[in-house]
Amino acid sequence: FESFFEKILKKQDFKSELEKILDNFNEIALINSLYNSFYRLFKIALYAKINGKIDFKELLGYTPPPQVGQNLSSQAFSLKIEQYKEIFTLLLKSEYELKTNPKLVKKEFLISNLLKLARILKN
């Protein structure tokens, strides 16, 4: 999942990994994983804005290796607060639709929402 998430963040073509991801995750689990990953980055960005520094021990409960910490920081700051808002809104609406609409073709719906997510990240 991490390499898939990185491809989404780096605005690379993630279609090749999407099939593998859809085979291993159900649609709601994938939405929740994306939400959790973006939320972790959002927490890092907000913490840095409020405190002027990043303390991974306080944020995540552990101190990641320096390279991982640097990667998380750069990912967190690559997005604007407004983009985070749009991402969370999209993911929550997607999860709601998946749970409440029994006539939905889930795989196609998820792909269309991932394309919307990619569009949000490119802005």
Placement of each model-derived feature along the sequence:
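C-terminal alpha-helical interaction modules of replication/initiation AAA+ assemblies
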Residues: 1-10, 14-123
